[in-house]
Regions:
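Class I SAM-dependent methyltransferase Rossmann-like catalytic core
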Residues: 2-66, 76, 80-97
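Short amphipathic alpha-helical segments, especially helix-boundary/capping motifs
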Residues: 23-28, 108-113, 162-164
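Short helix-terminating capping/connector loops at secondary-structure junctions
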Residues: 60-64, 116-122, 164-165
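Conserved acidic residues
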Residues: 65, 145, 166-169
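Conserved S-adenosyl-L-methionine
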Residues: 68-71
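Class I SAM-dependent methyltransferase SAM/SAH-binding core
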Residues: 75-156
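A short acidic, Gly/Pro-enriched loop at the edge of an enzyme's catalytic core
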Residues: 158-170
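A short SAM/SAH-binding and catalytic strip from SAM-dependent methyltransferases
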Residues: 168-179
């Protein structure tokens, strides 16, 4: 799998649709426009399962847990786990904002305030994705607590990524494996 212009190539997955262009955007407006138009439902189907697993692990361990989201993209699983949201609501939010004149910096500020306005579950989420713009956005708005931006199919984990993974209790994925 070769990297080109900071995105990932779809060659190993020729049967799958290629969404390279939406993962190189500096914010999630195009991501939600495209995937929302395809009736993308995997995160919604998985969120209650993830929430139940998290609750069970917290009860078992007696402490907040740490989650790794493989293929985290712009943090949609984190948003759905942390807050009473669904994919359609996020999609509508970003489609509505798509035609605004907001810069990415302004959208980051708006989203940071939006997500901070909800009661927060004491949970650490590490996002892992090949898209630096996507993980940077998710981290900047507070959806993920740490980011690993590496192509794990081509390179071994660097030390900072290994450090970020210490103490992970649960690994989830809807964007890298489920489709």
């Amino acid at each position: 799998m070769e990297t080109r212009n900071g995105s990932f190539a779809c060659e190993p997955n020729k049967a799958k649709a290629c969404f390279d262009s939406i993962y190189t955007e500096p914010d999630p407006r195009e991501y939600y426009r495209v995937l929302g138009g395809l009736d993308y439902v995997i995160p919604d189907l998985a969120k209650d399962i993830f929430r139940n697993l998290i609750a069970a692990l917290e009860q078992l361990r007696g402490r907040p847990i740490k989650v790794l989201d493989l293929g985290c993209s712009y943090g949609n699983n984190a948003a759905l786990i942390r807050f009473p949201l669904d994919f359609a609501r996020l999609q509508q939010r970003y489609v509505d904002l798509q035609h605004s004149n907001l810069s990415t910096r302004e959208l980051i500020t708006l989203d940071r305030h939006f997500f901070q306005s909800w009661p927060r579950h004491d949970l650490a989420i590490v996002g892992c994705d090949v898209s630096r713009p996507a993980t940077a956005y998710a981290r900047a708005v507070g959806l993920i607590d740490d980011a690993i931006t590496q192509n794990l199919e081509q390179e071994p984990l660097i030390q900072s990524s290994k450090d970020a993974l210490k103490g992970v209790d649960l690994i989830i994925s809807t964007g890298a494996i489920g489709y």
